Each structure stands twice: as structure tokens, then as C-alpha cells.
A protein has these predicted regions:
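Short secondary-structure junctions
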Residues: 58-63, 179-187, 309-320
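A conserved active-site cap/scaffold subdomain adjacent to cofactor or substrate pockets
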Residues: 126, 146-179, 228-262
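Short histidine-centered catalytic/ligand-binding loop motif
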Residues: 39-43, 152-168, 289-297
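A carboxyl-terminal module marker
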Residues: 191-327
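Class II aminoacyl-tRNA synthetase-like tRNA-binding/catalytic domains
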Residues: 2-145, 157, 212-240
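Beta-rich nucleic-acid/ligand-interaction surfaces
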Residues: 64-93, 184-210, 321-327
Length: 327
């Protein structure tokens, strides 16, 4: 039976209190994100329906369910997960910094930094030789898209004396996941991928409505990450995966991520189980607007995207550069 683990942070509490007293643009943007609901907990939310479906699959029924802070350190988000110092995700144009060392977490994979340093979890690993967890949550997305997305990460660590984890184990878990969501007859393929915290990494694509669609990324836990958490890679091994709310959008035919956040009863009443299908509501048709402007060629476009969101807020699903001309 699954066990809920909530990891709280006094440091996060203090940072949020300090943030509430600030009125600068950066602080207002961060507060806007923190005020958004976590849809993995909201009834009639496609994201919660997806998560509930997953935790009831045979492999995941006994996994720990982990909740951890939304404001974390760069060490917890990047360093411990083997992220290079020059990785784009570390830039202030891609990540919300509260100060030099504290950020809004950018991915749920950062739960490793809390779960793998939890005393009771480590005691269980030593005693039983295996630990496993799922961590759902709301994370900050890149600044050109809707301001938040939901991600679900899975992690299994075990002693090699108990079993050696291979890429086949990784594929088996992903196939079970895909079949559990899309049905037993789903067609899939694997593509080699790369993540700083895993090796032998894979992207899984499924055939859906005549098109190949990426559904998740996964890999074997990187030995350096195990070392970073004080676990000897000669003794321990494991696998990990992660996917986002796009899975719910694909499965339920949701064309616009803003629909996932709606409280309109005409929308929320449509989502009852994993096989629910979205039907168009006239209030939410997608429209496109082109804007032309002259800017300094050295400007970072993420800053412009942020300004658009400051004014339009959740009316905007995505801002992107279509073309550029330099004279």
C-alpha cells in the first residue's frame, strides 16, 4: 500500500513570507505562480484523473507518494542531479530566482534531493533493499508558455544484490504506463534520449490518432547522482521516468492547456475518468495574433514573453518567435 510523504521546509516558509512583502516585478511573477492550484489534487481535473489512474497500476500501488517544497535551492534542483553549470535551465531567463541560490523548482525530478536524504526512506532502503516513489506536482515552465505545468516523476532504487536494473526493466515500466493510460493495443517505439541524471535514457513515443507522440522520458539512475546522495553505485542501481500533463491532453483530446485550469462547470463536468473526451466549449476557441516590432538584437526574448504574460495573464497559452529580419 502506498505511503504519503510530505517534506516541509522552514526555509521555504521564510522565503515565502519575505516574498509576500515584496512588490517588484519578479516577486509578483513568482507569487502569481505560487497562487495557482495544484491540479493533481483537484477533483474533476484531467491531471488528477491521470495521476489516480497511474497509482492504481500494479507496479505503482506500493510506491511512496512524495510532496516536497516548491521553492528549493539550485543545489537541490541542479547540482545534485548532475546538471552542467552551463545548462540553459540555470539561466535567469529560464528560471525564476528568488535570490542567488533559491529558485522556483523547474522539474519534479528534484524530489530526489529530498526523498533520497529522508532518514526513514534510507532506513527502509537499508532494511528492505528497495525504495520507490512517485512525485506529482506543479512546476514552473519556460516563460514562453502557460506559466505552469504538471509533472509526475517516478523513481526506484534497489540494492544490486536484490536485482540488477536494466534498460529492459525501464522499457517494461514505460509500456505498462502507456497501456494503463491508452489501452492494451497501443503501438509504441523507443528513441535514445539524454538527461543529466540518467544514462541509457529513452524517450517513449506512441501512435495516437495516426501520429507519433512523445509521452515520457526515462533512464537508469546515473551513478554520479547516487554518489551525490551518499549511495554507492557499486551497491545500488535504479530507474527513473517523468512525464507531464500533456499525456492527459492527448488522452482526453484537450487542445489548449488553459482548459486544464478552467473552473467552468461546462468543462469540469466533462472529466469523470481516464476515458473522458473533451467537447468544445465556445468560450475557449484558440485564436492567433501576430505582432511585429523593432528590438535590440541582443534582447533575450524570454523577457519579452514575460511582459506579454504580465498583461494578458492566463489568456495566453503560448508566445513564440515566428520569423525575424535583420538589417
Amino acid at each position: 500500500m502506498s505511503r504519503k510523504i510530505t517534506i516541509k521546509s522552514d526555509e521555504e516558509k521564510s522565503l515565502i513570507e519575505a516574498l509576500s512583502k515584496r512588490q517588484d516585478v519578479k516577486a509578483e511573477r513568482i507569487k502569481r505562480f505560487l497562487a495557482l492550484p495544484d491540479l493533481t489534487k483537484k477533483e474533476n481535473s484531467p491531471v488528477k484523473i491521470l495521476f489516480d489512474q497511474i497509482i492504481n497500476l500494479p507496479t505503482f500501488r506500493d510506491f511512496d507518494l512524495v510532496e516536497f517544497p516548491k521553492i528549493i535551492t539550485t543545489e537541490e534542483c541542479f547540482d545534485l542531479l548532475n546538471t552542467p553549470n552551463d545548462h540553459p535551465a540555470r539561466k535567469e531567463t529560464d528560471t525564476y530566482y528568488l535570490d542567488d541560490t533559491h529558485i522556483l523548482r523547474t522539474h519534479t525530478t528534484a524530489f530526489w534531493s529530498f526523498y533520497l536524504r529522508d532518514k526513514k526512506v534510507l532506513e527502509k532502503l537499508e532494511k528492505e533493499g528497495e525504495i520507490a516513489a512517485l512525485a506529482p506536482g506543479k512546476d514552473e515552465i519556460d516563460r514562453s508558455h502557460y506559466p505552469a505545468f504538471h509533472q509526475i516523476d517516478g523513481l526506484l532504487i534497489c540494492k544490486k544484490s536484490k536485482r540488477i536494473i536494466t534498460q529492459k526493466d525501464l522499457k517494461d515500466v514505460q509500456v505498462e504506463l502507456a497501456k494503463g493510460i491508452f489501452g492494451p493495443d497501443i503501438e509504441w517505439k523507443f528513441i535514445t534520449d539524454n538527461f543529466p541524471y540518467t544514462f541509457d535514457s529513452l524517450e517513449m513515443d506512441i501512435m495516437f490518432n495516426g501520429n507519433w507522440m512523445e509521452v515520457n522520458g526515462a533512464g537508469l539512475v546515473h551513478p554520479q547522482c547516487l554518489k551525490n546522495f551518499g549511495l554507492n553505485p557499486e551497491i545500488y542501481n535504479g530507474w527513473a521516468f517523468g512525464f507531464g500533463d500533456r499525456l492527459a491532453m492527448i488522452k482526453m483530446g484537450i487542445p489548449d492547456i488553459r482548459i486544464m485550469w478552467s473552473n467552468d462547470p461546462r468543462i469540469t463536468s466533462q472529466f469523470k475518468d481516464i476515458n473522458s473526451k473533451y467537447k468544445e466549449v465556445s468560450k475557449y476557441p484558440g485564436t492567433y495574433r501576430d505582432i511585429s516590432f523593432i528590438i535590440d538584437k541582443n534582447i533575450n526574448l524570454n523577457n519579452y514573453y514575460e511582459i506579454v504574460r504580465d498583461f494578458a495573464d492566463d489568456l495566453i497559452e503560448e508566445v513564440k518567435l515566428l520569423d525575424e529580419y535583420e538589417n
